[in-house]
Regions:
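ER-lumen resident redox/N-glycosylation machinery signature
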Residues: 1-148
């Protein structure tokens, strides 16, 4: 995620504290960066950023087109948008597929999260991406009574 801003722009100044809070609260979960378009016009043009502040979320790398965030400039809203875009390598484990999960890739250790959440936690998504080559991540939701 990148914030494109100009240090002397009033709207950019308004978002600064919220973006800093976002970076602190989501440390280790989201990669958060910023580019001053006054200092680096070429980079801003490369990403087709012509007005500031602009927040762009990238899923895998900066080579993809990214998606512009157009919602509320409050750190929780921005974080919610970005975490929905995160890649996840977490398998949903059910009573029907748990054997396949444990038999898949026998050389890898398996991590299972038992949760009451209806969606995968951002930190678990981040861990699954970070360790996808070494570990298999699975999630068992509370509706899977047979597995609990």
């Amino acid at each position: 995620m990148i914030l494109f801003y100009k240090w002397n722009d009033e709207e950019s100044k308004k978002i600064k504290d919220e973006y800093r809070t976002l970076a602190e609260k989501m440390y280790g979960v989201l990669k958060v960066g910023a580019v001053d378009c006054q200092d680096d016009e070429e980079l801003c043009e490369e990403f087709a950023v012509y007005s500031v502040p602009t927040i762009m979320v990238f899923q895998e790398s900066y080579s993809d087109d990214g998606e512009r965030y157009t919602g509320n400039i409050e750190w929780r809203s921005i974080a919610n948008f970005a975490t929905k875009k995160m890649q996840s390598f977490v398998s949903i484990v059910t009573g029907e597929n748990y054997k396949q999960f444990f038999e898949r890739e026998p050389t890898k250790y398996k991590i299972l999260l038992f949760t009451e959440r209806k969606t995968t936690a951002p930190i678990f998504k981040a861990l699954s991406k970070q360790y996808k080559d070494k570990l298999l991540f699975g999630e068992v939701r509370k509706s899977e009574i047979d597995l609990i």
